[in-house]
Each structure stands twice: as structure tokens, then as C-alpha cells.
């Protein structure tokens, strides 16, 4: 730049000044456009206009079971909170594999969500070849609740405790049938773990969900089975079945007079439990995942919701997506070891 007589810098003028102004204008215009675009995108992402249409909950078991009951309760509350219908779509079969595969292949837009159990996500991978990867193909939203199983027997079966059941099975090898909500589920594993630990011979009969399995138990088609405490409680109270044990390491506060299987001599350390989890297709917008998690957690800890389900022995969890992802990885290792040690295989 040329200097004036007083030594100060003279500004450009004429063509130079016009060119400089044009460049500055273009730069400012571009900056403004970028700013508007970025701020607009950020505003859209932050607001997440979700949901703006009905949401479908894929439940991996038949209507009437614990997973279905819990999913419908959450769906009702989400519908109330968001003003959009949350529709439960039961896709039973393959111990949850059919429904899980639907969600794994669904668009990651937040409108197809999986409600399932640990059987589908952390047990099935050790027992059969799956069309989905439990870690790679899903975005964990929240582990919503955990609960023990209850060992139920048909009231005509002359046993009132696990030791008596084992004694009967030993006296009549192969004569007793036990049901489950599907091969490879926690109820199936519970039966196989008991079979291995107690060295007894009994036959596993899998069904497509807890509801049809319970029908079989009530009709006497099977003599006993492990059932989630949520599903079992009303049947126990009605006297239609007899509870002889719970599957946790300790007794459940909901059934304080029912011993744990682990109290049985020779079965110390016995434990099989159930959790309900919410997952979405992989690569879903993290803000949508967080919105779904946040609203679900609010529902789980509403006094009305807790008062309805915690007396049944259902423990609300409401874990974050990151916590749930860690639980899945941990439980994949845990159940892999259990299945290998007990040499459990699907029929």
C-alpha cells in the first residue's frame, strides 16, 4: 500500500477499492449462507421433529406374555406423551429372532422399535445362526426392567419344592415335561441348568411365547416351567398354579415365602433371570435415540407405573443407551459361558 506524506497508510481507491469491496461482499454472502445453513441444520437436529407419525413396537413374543404386557404399558404412556399412536406388533417365533430381524432391517428413522428380552439379544447368538448381529445391527435405547423367573408346577403334580421335583424326576426318568416360551430363552436355560446340575432326565417342550406355554401348563400338557414373575403373579394368586421357587440368587420381595432355587442342596449359585430391552435399528439419529430413551425412562419411574409393576417383582432399570450397550456385551459373555458349561443345545 502507498504511504502518504505524513507516513500514514493510504487506502486503495478506484478499481482496487471496487474489486476489494466485491470480494468482501462475496465472502460475507458466502459466510452468511453457510451460517444460515449450519444454524438451520443444528436447529432442526436439536428440535428433532419426532415423532410426527405412528411408531411401531415390534414385540418378539405372542400376546399375553410378560414382554407383551410390559410393551403395551409403555406404548400407552408414550402415546399419551407424544400424541402419536404407538402400535404393538407381535412377531413371535424363533425365540425372538423373527421380530428382531424385522427391526434390524428397518429404516433407522425411529418408527420401528424392538421390544424384546435378553434371550433374543444375548442368548440366541450362542445357540443358532442368526440373520442379524446383536451388537452391530442395533442401536440400544434402554434396558427397561429386570425380573426373576418363578418355577411353576401344575397343581395336580405332587410336589411342593424343588427337592421334591428332583426326586420325582429321578423316580420317573423322562416322564416329566417342562415348557418354555421358546427354545433358547431364559426359561429353557433354567430347565436345562437344573437338569444338568441335578442330573435328572426330563423333556423340554418349547412354545411360541409365554402365553401358549402357560396354556399348556394349565391344561397339564407340561408339568412345570419357569415363567417371568410378572406373568406368574396373577396365576399364583388365583391358585391355578403352584410356585415352588424363584430363579434369582435370593428370594423375591414380591414372593417372600417362595424359596430361591439356589437354596436347594446341590444347586447353590443357580441363577437365571430376564430383562426387557428397547432397541432400534443401527445408525439411528442419536438425538432420536436419546429422545426415546428420555421419555421411556420418565414413564418407568412414574409412581403410577412403579406401583403397578414393582409389587410383581419387576425392577425398573431405565439405563442409558451406553449403559445398555455395555450390559449387552457383558451378558453375551456370561451366557456364552453358561451355555457351554451346561452343554445346552436347541432341539
Feature-to-residue mapping (PLM):
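Extracytoplasmic/secreted proteins, especially bacterial periplasmic and envelope-associated proteins
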Residues: 69, 73, 77, 98, ...
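A ligand-binding cleft/hinge motif common to bilobed small-molecule-binding domains
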Residues: 120-129, 188, 193-197, 224-258
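An extracytoplasmic/periplasmic, membrane-proximal ligand-sensing/linker region
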Residues: 8, 17-20, 52-54, 197, ...
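N-terminal (or domain-start) structured segment
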Residues: 44-136, 175-177, 183, 199-223, ...
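Short, low-complexity disordered leader/linker segments with a strong preference
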Residues: 1-52, 163, 347
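Hinge/capping helix and adjacent helix->loop/strand transition within the periplasmic-binding protein
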Residues: 105-111, 118, 125-212, 261-266, ...
Amino acid at each position: 500500500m502507498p504511504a502518504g506524506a505524513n507516513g500514514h497508510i493510504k487506502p486503495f481507491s478506484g478499481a482496487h477499492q471496487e474489486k476489494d469491496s466485491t470480494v468482501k461482499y462475496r465472502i460475507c454472502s458466502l459466510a452468511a449462507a453457510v451460517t444460515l445453513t449450519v444454524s438451520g441444520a443444528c436447529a432442526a437436529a436439536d428440535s428433532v421433529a419426532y415423532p410426527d407419525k405412528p411408531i411401531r413396537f415390534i414385540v418378539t413374543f405372542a400376546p399375553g406374555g410378560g414382554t407383551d404386557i410390559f410393551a403395551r404399558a409403555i406404548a400407552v404412556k408414550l402415546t399419551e406423551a407424544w400424541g402419536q399412536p404407538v402400535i404393538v406388533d407381535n412377531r413371535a417365533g424363533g425365540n425372538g429372532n423373527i421380530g428382531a430381524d424385522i427391526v434390524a432391517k428397518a429404516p433407522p428413522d425411529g418408527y420401528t422399535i424392538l421390544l424384546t428380552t435378553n434371550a433374543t439379544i444375548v442368548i440366541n447368538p450362542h445357540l443358532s445362526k442368526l440373520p442379524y448381529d446383536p451388537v452391530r445391527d442395533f442401536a440400544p435405547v434402554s434396558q427397561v426392567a429386570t425380573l426373576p423367573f418363578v418355577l411353576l408346577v401344575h397343581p395336580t403334580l405332587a410336589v411342593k419344592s424343588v427337592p421334591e421335583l428332583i426326586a420325582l424326576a429321578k423316580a420317573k426318568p423322562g416322564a416329566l415335561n417342562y415348557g418354555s416360551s421358546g427354545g433358547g430363552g431364559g426359561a429353557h436355560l433354567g430347565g436345562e441348568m437344573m437338569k444338568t446340575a441335578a442330573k435328572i432326565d426330563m423333556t423340554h417342550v418349547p412354545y411360541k411365547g409365554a402365553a401358549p406355554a402357560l396354556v399348556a401348563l394349565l391344561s397339564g400338557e407340561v408339568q412345570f416351567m419357569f415363567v417371568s414373575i410378572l406373568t406368574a403373579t396373577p396365576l399364583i394368586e388365583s391358585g391355578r398354579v403352584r410356585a415352588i421357587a424363584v430363579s434369582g440368587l435370593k428370594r423375591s420381595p414380591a414372593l417372600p415365602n417362595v424359596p430361591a432355587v439356589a437354596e436347594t442342596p446341590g444347586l447353590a449359585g443357580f441363577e437365571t433371570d430376564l430383562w426387557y430391552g428397547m432397541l432400534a435399528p443401527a445408525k439411528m439419529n442419536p438425538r432420536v435415540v436419546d429422545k426415546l430413551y428420555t421419555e421411556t425412562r420418565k414413564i418407568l419411574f412414574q409412581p403410577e407405573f412403579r406401583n403397578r409393576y414393582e409389587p410383581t417383582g419387576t425392577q425398573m432399570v431405565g439405563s442409558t443407551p451406553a449403559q445398555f450397550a455395555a450390559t449387552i456385551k457383558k451378558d453375551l459373555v456370561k451366557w456364552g459361558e453358561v451355555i457351554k458349561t451346561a452343554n445346552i443345545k436347541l432341539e
